Amino acid sequence: MANGNELPPDFDQSILESFANPNSTPTLSSNMIEEGLSSIVVSLIDPTATQLNSLKYLPNMEKLTLKCTGDIDLDPLENLSNLRHLQISNANIENIDFLDGNQCVASLDISDTSIANFSKLATLRQLKSLRLKNCDLDDLSFISSLNDLETLNLNDNNLENLTALNHMFSLKVLDIDGNDIFDLGALASLTQINWIHAARNNISDVSSITPLKNLAFLNLSHNEVSNIDPLSKLTKLQWIGIAFNRIRDISPLNSLPKLRYIDIEGDSFNHQSTRTHIPNLRARGIEIIS
């Protein structure tokens, strides 16, 4: 490390342009690097190898956003032991070994990114929020040890089952939109969940989610559901999406006291639902999209 106000000779000062405040480019010295900057937020678009290597001089960085195109080597990030929030998008990554043993990362957001090996995610047991959007995922075995997760976003992948989630008892928010899932049975014991986005899957049976008494938001649009009788037991539901399914009878929703919004676009309901139940729901002040 250089002394005084001299930065390390291999420090890429273009990083300064990426700090969170767009109206102020900070003057960085070696003293400042050594002493803190505990709330550093860096956003890099198509980072160069020099920029990534320079991040090792910012050990107190807490939040990092990388927007990339093409291959990227993230090994230089292994020294960022205080990193709490990491976002990566549009990259090709061989692995995420740099996170192995990290005890600080609480929020990880990886989207539109190809990763050859996800196994090191299993060591991030302190994670509270995980987003893996459009990452070509077809296996969740690595995720079963992340028991403290509260928010999980897995949309636009190739998942067929959710078995790996069946012991994630802290989970409150789950987004599995745009997969190939046909069974929600693995969620039956996750009674803390209050928000599920499960549109664009192959779900036909919703009986397995009746134990989820805290559900306030449920989106099942673009599935194969025909019977919504089980939903009548989810008395905390406020928002429900059942658009583009095979539902004929909407009457089970009459018993939901907190319901405020229903999306039924593309469904062909029977005469009784069209003439009686839907008007009655609207009369209660419920917004219905049809």
Give residue ranges: language-model regions.
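N-terminal capping/linker segments that flank leucine-rich repeat
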Residues: 1-109, 120, 124-125, 131, ...
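Short "repeat-start/strand-capping" segments in structured domains, especially the N-termini
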Residues: 60, 81-82, 103-104, 125-126, ...
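Solenoidal tandem-repeat scaffolds enriched in leucines and small polar residues
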Residues: 129-139, 150-158, 173-178
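Eukaryotic tandem repeat interaction scaffolds
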Residues: 160, 165, 169-233
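Ankyrin-repeat and related helical/solenoid repeat scaffolds used for protein-protein interactions
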Residues: 214-271
